[in-house]
């Protein structure tokens, strides 16, 4: 139907590429939505991946109580669609909410988190990045598959921790 002029009252009328010409040349809302989508994508995808990888590397250690901490980091992914989380975000992002109260402690004025289109996109990106738990679990399961003998051999060869991360862990 994209090649037709169509509504529910009349039969479709073939218009060729006219709809696409209008979309790409005259429709400002289309280009605005593309810009917002690109901004959202370029913020959330790297943000979520980097945060999930960092947390997975930290949680890959065999420490006492680490399973509890892993669970705590995964919970936001499970709760993402609940009403309780919606209320929590509302409390956090209100003009006199928790985050603005913390900003006030360091003498930063209140931020209107949803008051402008740019801040709304950033706020929505933060909400998406907050759900990094599923990505973290995937990274953590992959990290658990790396044989410890590779790290032992690298230590014997004198490799530094950053070198082991970039040559063994990350690949």
Q: In which residue ranges do the predicted regions lie?
A:
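A structural signal for multi-pass alpha-helical bundles of membrane permease subunits
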Residues: 1-171
